[in-house]
Protein backbone atom coordinates (compact mmCIF):
# COMPACT_ATOMS: atom_id res chain seq x y z
CA UNK A 1 0.00 0.00 0.00
CA UNK A 2 1.64 3.19 -1.15
CA UNK A 3 1.71 6.09 1.32
CA UNK A 4 -1.10 8.60 0.92
CA UNK A 5 -0.83 12.16 2.10
CA UNK A 6 -3.25 14.93 2.74
CA UNK A 7 -2.84 18.45 4.07
CA UNK A 8 -5.13 20.20 6.52
CA UNK A 9 -5.56 23.66 5.07
CA UNK A 10 -5.58 26.90 6.97
CA UNK A 11 -2.19 27.06 8.74
CA UNK A 12 0.80 28.78 7.20
CA UNK A 13 3.11 29.27 10.18
CA UNK A 14 6.63 27.89 9.75
CA UNK A 15 7.89 27.94 13.34
CA UNK A 16 9.39 24.46 13.39
CA UNK A 17 7.90 21.02 12.86
CA UNK A 18 6.84 18.28 15.27
CA UNK A 19 6.83 14.79 13.74
CA UNK A 20 4.43 12.25 15.20
CA UNK A 21 4.05 8.51 14.68
CA UNK A 22 0.71 7.03 15.73
CA UNK A 23 -0.69 3.52 15.95
CA UNK A 24 -4.45 4.00 16.19
CA UNK A 25 -5.35 0.68 17.73
CA UNK A 26 -8.82 -0.77 18.17
CA UNK A 27 -8.20 -1.18 21.91
CA UNK A 28 -5.21 1.05 22.68
CA UNK A 29 -3.50 3.87 20.79
CA UNK A 30 0.23 4.50 21.05
CA UNK A 31 2.01 7.65 19.93
CA UNK A 32 5.64 8.74 19.69
CA UNK A 33 6.96 12.19 18.77
CA UNK A 34 10.29 13.81 17.98
CA UNK A 35 10.14 15.81 21.23
CA UNK A 36 10.53 12.54 23.16
CA UNK A 37 6.86 12.00 24.01
CA UNK A 38 5.73 8.37 24.19
CA UNK A 39 2.21 7.65 25.38
CA UNK A 40 -0.30 4.82 25.21
CA UNK A 41 -4.01 5.30 25.99
CA UNK A 42 -7.21 3.33 25.63
CA UNK A 43 -8.87 4.03 22.27
CA UNK A 44 -12.12 5.11 23.87
CA UNK A 45 -14.13 8.33 23.94
CA UNK A 46 -17.00 9.02 26.33
CA UNK A 47 -19.73 11.59 26.88
CA UNK A 48 -21.43 12.04 30.31
CA UNK A 49 -24.76 10.19 30.47
CA UNK A 50 -26.58 12.85 32.49
CA UNK A 51 -26.06 16.07 34.50
CA UNK A 52 -24.84 14.08 37.53
CA UNK A 53 -22.03 12.39 35.59
CA UNK A 54 -21.25 15.73 33.93
CA UNK A 55 -20.87 17.35 37.36
CA UNK A 56 -18.78 14.45 38.69
CA UNK A 57 -16.37 14.47 35.74
CA UNK A 58 -16.32 18.23 35.22
CA UNK A 59 -16.09 17.99 31.44
CA UNK A 60 -18.25 17.37 28.38
CA UNK A 61 -16.04 14.73 26.79
CA UNK A 62 -13.60 12.23 28.32
CA UNK A 63 -10.80 10.27 26.65
CA UNK A 64 -8.50 7.33 27.02
CA UNK A 65 -7.65 5.95 30.43
CA UNK A 66 -10.04 8.31 32.23
CA UNK A 67 -12.92 7.31 29.95
CA UNK A 68 -12.14 3.63 30.53
CA UNK A 69 -12.05 4.14 34.30
CA UNK A 70 -15.42 5.96 34.37
CA UNK A 71 -17.09 4.05 31.51
CA UNK A 72 -20.22 3.22 33.55
CA UNK A 73 -21.00 6.93 33.85
CA UNK A 74 -20.43 7.58 30.16
CA UNK A 75 -21.82 6.86 26.74
CA UNK A 76 -18.63 5.37 25.33
CA UNK A 77 -17.43 4.63 21.82
CA UNK A 78 -14.36 2.74 20.68
CA UNK A 79 -14.18 4.36 17.24
CA UNK A 80 -11.91 1.70 15.76
CA UNK A 81 -13.44 -1.42 17.34
CA UNK A 82 -13.74 -4.46 15.05
CA UNK A 83 -11.88 -2.47 12.41
CA UNK A 84 -14.69 0.09 12.10
CA UNK A 85 -13.51 3.12 10.06
CA UNK A 86 -10.10 1.46 9.62
CA UNK A 87 -10.80 -1.79 7.82
CA UNK A 88 -14.32 -3.23 7.82
CA UNK A 89 -17.43 -1.75 6.29
CA UNK A 90 -19.54 -0.22 9.07
CA UNK A 91 -22.19 -2.93 8.60
CA UNK A 92 -19.51 -5.65 8.92
CA UNK A 93 -18.27 -4.04 12.11
CA UNK A 94 -21.80 -3.99 13.54
CA UNK A 95 -22.04 -0.19 13.56
CA UNK A 96 -25.63 1.00 12.91
CA UNK A 97 -25.74 3.63 10.13
CA UNK A 98 -27.26 6.18 12.52
CA UNK A 99 -24.26 5.76 14.85
CA UNK A 100 -21.60 6.06 12.15
CA UNK A 101 -21.46 9.87 12.44
CA UNK A 102 -20.82 9.51 16.18
CA UNK A 103 -17.99 7.05 15.49
CA UNK A 104 -16.41 9.54 13.08
CA UNK A 105 -16.75 12.33 15.64
CA UNK A 106 -15.17 10.11 18.30
CA UNK A 107 -12.29 9.25 15.97
CA UNK A 108 -11.61 12.92 15.25
CA UNK A 109 -11.73 13.84 18.95
CA UNK A 110 -9.48 10.91 19.90
CA UNK A 111 -6.82 11.90 17.35
CA UNK A 112 -6.93 15.49 18.60
CA UNK A 113 -6.56 14.31 22.21
CA UNK A 114 -3.64 11.97 21.46
CA UNK A 115 -1.79 14.71 19.57
CA UNK A 116 -2.37 17.07 22.52
CA UNK A 117 -0.49 14.57 24.72
CA UNK A 118 2.58 15.36 22.60
CA UNK A 119 2.33 19.01 23.70
CA UNK A 120 3.16 20.67 20.36
CA UNK A 121 4.27 24.29 20.99
CA UNK A 122 1.91 26.94 19.68
CA UNK A 123 2.58 27.70 16.03
CA UNK A 124 4.40 24.41 15.41
CA UNK A 125 3.61 22.46 12.26
CA UNK A 126 2.51 18.91 13.05
CA UNK A 127 3.34 16.21 10.49
CA UNK A 128 2.21 12.66 11.16
CA UNK A 129 2.40 9.09 9.94
CA UNK A 130 -0.47 6.84 10.98
CA UNK A 131 -0.75 3.08 10.64
CA UNK A 132 -3.82 1.41 9.16
CA UNK A 133 -4.64 -2.29 8.64
CA UNK A 134 -2.83 -3.88 5.72
CA UNK A 135 -5.87 -4.23 3.44
CA UNK A 136 -7.78 -1.10 4.45
CA UNK A 137 -9.91 0.21 1.61
CA UNK A 138 -9.68 3.67 0.05
CA UNK A 139 -12.89 4.54 1.92
CA UNK A 140 -11.36 3.47 5.24
CA UNK A 141 -8.18 5.46 4.58
CA UNK A 142 -10.29 8.50 3.74
CA UNK A 143 -12.08 8.08 7.08
CA UNK A 144 -8.69 8.19 8.82
CA UNK A 145 -7.72 11.26 6.81
CA UNK A 146 -10.97 12.95 7.85
CA UNK A 147 -10.24 12.13 11.51
CA UNK A 148 -6.88 13.91 11.18
CA UNK A 149 -8.14 17.09 9.52
CA UNK A 150 -7.56 20.17 11.61
CA UNK A 151 -5.02 18.41 13.84
CA UNK A 152 -2.19 17.60 11.40
CA UNK A 153 -0.78 19.82 8.67
CA UNK A 154 0.13 16.73 6.65
CA UNK A 155 -0.68 13.06 7.20
CA UNK A 156 0.72 9.90 5.66
CA UNK A 157 -1.26 6.66 5.96
CA UNK A 158 0.83 3.46 5.83
CA UNK A 159 0.05 -0.14 6.67
CA UNK A 160 0.69 -1.03 10.32
CA UNK A 161 3.03 -3.96 9.60
CA UNK A 162 5.04 -1.76 7.22
CA UNK A 163 5.48 0.78 10.04
CA UNK A 164 6.76 -2.03 12.28
CA UNK A 165 9.14 -3.23 9.56
CA UNK A 166 10.49 0.28 8.99
CA UNK A 167 11.03 0.89 12.68
CA UNK A 168 12.90 -2.38 13.18
CA UNK A 169 14.81 -2.05 9.89
CA UNK A 170 13.33 -5.34 8.71
CA UNK A 171 12.80 -4.22 5.14
CA UNK A 172 13.90 -7.18 3.02
CA UNK A 173 12.97 -10.87 2.83
CA UNK A 174 10.79 -10.78 5.95
CA UNK A 175 7.24 -11.53 7.03
CA UNK A 176 5.69 -9.15 9.57
CA UNK A 177 2.71 -10.38 11.63
CA UNK A 178 1.04 -7.52 13.55
CA UNK A 179 -1.58 -8.89 15.97
CA UNK A 180 -3.77 -6.09 17.27
CA UNK A 181 -7.18 -6.03 18.95
CA UNK A 182 -9.36 -5.72 15.86
CA UNK A 183 -7.20 -7.19 13.09
CA UNK A 184 -4.16 -9.36 12.48
CA UNK A 185 -2.11 -7.91 9.63
CA UNK A 186 0.53 -9.83 7.68
CA UNK A 187 2.98 -8.12 5.36
CA UNK A 188 5.68 -9.45 3.04
CA UNK A 189 8.73 -7.18 2.91
CA UNK A 190 10.99 -7.24 -0.16
CA UNK A 191 12.95 -3.99 0.04
CA UNK A 192 10.20 -1.72 -1.27
CA UNK A 193 6.86 -0.31 -0.13
CA UNK A 194 4.53 -3.34 -0.02
CA UNK A 195 1.69 -3.57 -2.54
CA UNK A 196 -1.78 -4.95 -1.85
CA UNK A 197 -0.60 -8.37 -3.05
CA UNK A 198 2.07 -8.35 -0.34
CA UNK A 199 -0.45 -8.05 2.48
CA UNK A 200 -3.17 -10.05 4.21
CA UNK A 201 -5.61 -8.99 6.93
CA UNK A 202 -7.61 -11.26 9.23
CA UNK A 203 -10.42 -10.21 11.55
CA UNK A 204 -9.32 -12.80 14.12
CA UNK A 205 -7.24 -10.90 16.66
CA UNK A 206 -7.42 -9.77 20.29
CA UNK A 207 -11.13 -8.92 20.37
CA UNK A 208 -11.92 -12.25 18.73
CA UNK A 209 -9.96 -14.06 21.46
CA UNK A 210 -11.78 -12.11 24.19
CA UNK A 211 -15.24 -12.86 22.80
CA UNK A 212 -14.49 -16.54 22.22
CA UNK A 213 -12.97 -16.92 25.69
CA UNK A 214 -16.03 -15.20 27.18
CA UNK A 215 -18.38 -17.74 25.56
CA UNK A 216 -16.19 -20.72 26.47
CA UNK A 217 -15.88 -19.64 30.11
CA UNK A 218 -19.60 -18.92 30.36
CA UNK A 219 -20.31 -22.45 29.14
CA UNK A 220 -17.71 -24.08 31.41
CA UNK A 221 -18.49 -22.00 34.52
CA UNK A 222 -22.17 -20.94 34.36
CA UNK A 223 -22.07 -20.01 38.06
CA UNK A 224 -19.43 -17.29 37.52
CA UNK A 225 -20.21 -13.59 37.15
CA UNK A 226 -17.82 -11.74 34.84
CA UNK A 227 -17.59 -9.21 32.02
CA UNK A 228 -15.65 -9.09 28.77
CA UNK A 229 -13.18 -6.66 30.38
CA UNK A 230 -12.51 -9.13 33.21
CA UNK A 231 -11.81 -11.81 30.60
CA UNK A 232 -9.46 -9.45 28.76
CA UNK A 233 -7.55 -8.68 31.96
CA UNK A 234 -7.20 -12.41 32.71
CA UNK A 235 -5.93 -13.00 29.18
CA UNK A 236 -3.34 -10.24 29.46
CA UNK A 237 -2.08 -11.65 32.77
CA UNK A 238 -1.70 -15.25 31.64
CA UNK A 239 -2.29 -15.90 27.95
CA UNK A 240 -0.58 -18.82 26.27
CA UNK A 241 -1.12 -21.12 23.32
CA UNK A 242 1.26 -23.96 24.14
CA UNK A 243 1.13 -26.64 26.81
CA UNK A 244 2.62 -25.16 29.97
CA UNK A 245 2.26 -26.05 33.62
CA UNK A 246 0.97 -22.59 34.55
CA UNK A 247 -2.69 -22.27 35.41
CA UNK A 248 -4.96 -19.32 34.73
CA UNK A 249 -6.78 -18.94 38.04
CA UNK A 250 -9.15 -16.02 38.63
CA UNK A 251 -11.25 -14.94 41.58
CA UNK A 252 -14.64 -13.76 40.37
CA UNK A 253 -18.02 -13.47 42.12
CA UNK A 254 -20.38 -16.42 41.83
CA UNK A 255 -24.15 -16.11 41.38
CA UNK A 256 -24.48 -15.21 45.06
CA UNK A 257 -21.83 -12.52 44.80
CA UNK A 258 -19.22 -14.46 46.80
CA UNK A 259 -15.61 -14.30 45.57
CA UNK A 260 -14.83 -17.72 44.09
CA UNK A 261 -11.76 -19.12 42.37
CA UNK A 262 -12.21 -20.45 38.84
CA UNK A 263 -9.71 -22.31 36.66
CA UNK A 264 -10.05 -20.90 33.13
CA UNK A 265 -6.78 -22.33 31.77
CA UNK A 266 -8.40 -24.62 29.19
CA UNK A 267 -10.81 -21.97 27.89
CA UNK A 268 -8.15 -19.25 27.59
CA UNK A 269 -5.75 -21.57 25.81
CA UNK A 270 -8.40 -22.69 23.32
CA UNK A 271 -9.41 -19.09 22.59
CA UNK A 272 -5.81 -17.91 22.18
CA UNK A 273 -4.96 -20.77 19.82
CA UNK A 274 -7.97 -19.96 17.64
CA UNK A 275 -6.15 -17.13 15.84
CA UNK A 276 -3.23 -19.35 14.81
CA UNK A 277 -4.81 -21.11 11.77
CA UNK A 278 -5.52 -17.80 10.03
CA UNK A 279 -1.99 -16.56 10.74
CA UNK A 280 -0.44 -19.72 9.33
CA UNK A 281 -2.75 -19.63 6.30
CA UNK A 282 -1.74 -16.02 5.66
CA UNK A 283 1.95 -16.87 5.92
CA UNK A 284 1.46 -19.79 3.52
CA UNK A 285 -0.28 -17.52 1.02
CA UNK A 286 2.43 -14.86 1.14
CA UNK A 287 5.30 -17.36 0.96
CA UNK A 288 3.88 -19.56 -1.80
CA UNK A 289 3.30 -16.57 -4.09
CA UNK A 290 6.81 -15.17 -3.53
CA UNK A 291 9.85 -15.69 -5.74
CA UNK A 292 10.85 -19.34 -5.19
CA UNK A 293 14.52 -18.39 -4.92
CA UNK A 294 13.87 -16.26 -1.83
CA UNK A 295 11.12 -18.24 -0.05
CA UNK A 296 13.47 -20.03 2.33
CA UNK A 297 15.22 -16.80 3.31
CA UNK A 298 11.86 -15.17 4.05
CA UNK A 299 10.75 -18.07 6.25
CA UNK A 300 13.83 -17.51 8.40
CA UNK A 301 12.65 -13.98 9.20
CA UNK A 302 9.07 -14.03 10.54
CA UNK A 303 8.53 -11.16 13.01
CA UNK A 304 5.61 -10.97 15.46
CA UNK A 305 4.40 -7.55 16.63
CA UNK A 306 1.36 -6.00 18.30
CA UNK A 307 -0.22 -6.84 21.64
CA UNK A 308 -1.11 -10.36 20.51
CA UNK A 309 2.55 -11.16 19.93
CA UNK A 310 2.86 -11.47 23.71
CA UNK A 311 0.88 -14.73 23.70
CA UNK A 312 3.34 -17.16 25.25
CA UNK A 313 4.35 -19.95 22.92
CA UNK A 314 2.87 -18.38 19.77
CA UNK A 315 6.28 -18.10 18.11
CA UNK A 316 7.07 -21.77 18.76
CA UNK A 317 3.64 -22.90 17.57
CA UNK A 318 4.08 -21.07 14.25
CA UNK A 319 7.60 -22.48 13.88
CA UNK A 320 6.22 -26.00 14.35
CA UNK A 321 3.68 -25.44 11.59
CA UNK A 322 6.36 -24.06 9.27
CA UNK A 323 8.23 -27.38 9.40
CA UNK A 324 6.25 -28.51 6.35
CA UNK A 325 8.00 -25.71 4.42
CA UNK A 326 11.41 -26.83 5.57
CA UNK A 327 11.32 -24.88 8.82
CA UNK A 328 11.36 -21.24 9.77
CA UNK A 329 12.43 -18.82 12.49
CA UNK A 330 9.92 -16.66 14.34
CA UNK A 331 10.96 -13.76 16.60
CA UNK A 332 9.10 -11.07 18.53
CA UNK A 333 9.71 -7.31 18.49
CA UNK A 334 11.17 -5.94 21.72
CA UNK A 335 8.49 -3.29 22.26
CA UNK A 336 5.17 -4.63 20.99
CA UNK A 337 3.18 -1.69 22.35
CA UNK A 338 5.27 0.99 20.63
CA UNK A 339 6.71 -0.87 17.62
CA UNK A 340 4.11 0.57 15.23
CA UNK A 341 4.29 4.13 16.59
CA UNK A 342 8.10 4.08 16.69
CA UNK A 343 8.25 2.91 13.08
CA UNK A 344 5.72 5.52 11.97
CA UNK A 345 7.76 8.23 13.73
CA UNK A 346 11.00 7.03 12.13
CA UNK A 347 9.34 7.14 8.71
CA UNK A 348 7.98 10.65 9.35
CA UNK A 349 11.36 11.95 10.49
CA UNK A 350 13.21 10.28 7.59
CA UNK A 351 11.03 11.82 4.88
CA UNK A 352 12.83 14.74 3.16
CA UNK A 353 11.47 18.19 3.96
CA UNK A 354 10.79 18.67 0.27
CA UNK A 355 8.50 15.63 0.36
CA UNK A 356 6.30 17.21 3.02
CA UNK A 357 6.36 20.57 1.18
CA UNK A 358 5.08 18.90 -1.97
CA UNK A 359 1.84 17.93 -0.26
CA UNK A 360 1.20 21.18 1.56
Residue ranges and their predicted role:
Residues 29, 45, 111, 148, ...:
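Residue-level signature of catalytic and energy-coupling elements of molecular machines
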Residues 1-15, 152-177, 341-349:
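Conserved phosphate-binding catalytic cores of ATP/NTP-utilizing and phosphoryl-transfer enzymes
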Residues 47-63, 190-276, 301:
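Phosphate-binding glycine-rich/basic clefts of nucleotide- and phosphate-handling proteins
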Residues 102-169, 206:
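Active-site neighborhood for divalent-cation/phosphate handling
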Residues 99-104, 108, 156, 163-167, ...:
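Helical "lid/coupling" subdomains associated with nucleotide-phosphate turnover
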Residues 114-126, 220-227, 283-301:
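Phosphate/pyrophosphate-binding loops at sites that engage ATP/ADP/AMP, CoA/4′-phosphopantetheine
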Residues 24-129, 279:
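Conserved phosphate-binding loops in N-terminal lobes of ATP-dependent enzymes
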Residues 7-42, 168-196, 213, 242-246:
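Gly/Thr-rich phosphate-binding beta-strand-loop-beta motif of the actin/hexokinase/Hsp70
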Amino acid sequence: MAPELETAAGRTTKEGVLYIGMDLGCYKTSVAATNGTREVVYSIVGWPKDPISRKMLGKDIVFGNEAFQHRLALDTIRPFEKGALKYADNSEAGVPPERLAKYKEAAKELVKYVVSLCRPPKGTLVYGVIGSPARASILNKQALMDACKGTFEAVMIVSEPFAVAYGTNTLEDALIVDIGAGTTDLCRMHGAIPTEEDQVTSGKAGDFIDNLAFELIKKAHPEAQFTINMVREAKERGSFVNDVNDKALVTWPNKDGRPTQFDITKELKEACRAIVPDIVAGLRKLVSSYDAEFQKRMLQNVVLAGGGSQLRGLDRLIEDDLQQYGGGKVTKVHEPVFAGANGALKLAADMPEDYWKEVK
